[in-house]
Design a protein with these regions (language model features):
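GST-like domain detector, emphasizing the conserved glutathione-binding G-site
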Residues: 1-115, 129
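Amphipathic alpha-helical protein-protein interaction surfaces
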Residues: 36, 65, 165, 178-181
Length: 189
């Protein structure tokens, strides 16, 4: 997400890779030396070190002179933008990542968590589909950082088969993947 945002804004950056443990997928000690939580992504800029995609994106956008990739604060679209920017991590990521993790283990579908996750997936993706059936982007008529935040989670959901019968969401995802800055960011892996 952060690389995609930097590419959209044409801001130069230096990318530093920290290899995770191949078995545990845990971050290496080198990442903990950058930030005590050792979670990626992390940005280090002018003496400021932040983790969390949403916080990093807001920091980067606040460094821009113009309101690029977010609606004017006085507009109704700004509040839609905020909702979707935070929905990606606040509400949507839990059921999507839980589905991903549960797909990696043997389950019989009767655990309480399975029912909760299934309900949340249905609710969240119905909301997304309804929104995207009415407009091209999450925060109105213009591409914004909220679209970047949402796209990455939707990609994971697509890989898990959670976008079946969600034609507007699938079409949206195709259009996001066609953006040159997305493609450049995706080339980094």
């Amino acid at each position: 997400r952060v690389i995609w945002l930097l590419e959209e804004l044409e801001i130069p950056y230096t990318l530093v890779h920290h290899q995770r443990d191949p078995l545990t997928r845990l971050a290496p000690e080198s990442l903990r030396l950058v930030h005590p939580l050792a979670k990626a992504p992390i940005i280090v800029d002018n003496g400021i070190t932040l983790c969390e995609s949403g916080a990093i994106m807001e920091y980067i956008l606040n460094q821009c002179v113009d309101d690029i990739l977010r609606p004017q604060k006085s507009s109704a679209e700004y509040y839609q933008y905020l909702e979707w920017l935070h929905f990606a991590e606040g509400s949507l990521s839990l059921p999507v990542i839980s589905t991903l993790l549960m797909s990696m283990e043997q389950r019989d579908g009767r655990q309480a968590l399975d029912g909760y996750i299934a309900k949340e997936v249905q609710l969240d993706f119905s909301y997304i589909e309804n929104t995207l059936s009415k407009r091209q982007y999450f925060a109105g008529d213009s591409f914004s950082a909220a679209d970047i935040m949402m796209t990455i989670v939707l990609e994971i959901a697509e890989g898990l088969g959670l976008l079946e019968n969600r034609d507007s969401t699938k079409a949206y995802l195709v259009s996001m993947k066609q953006r040159p800055a997305y493609q450049k960011a995706a080339s980094f892996g």
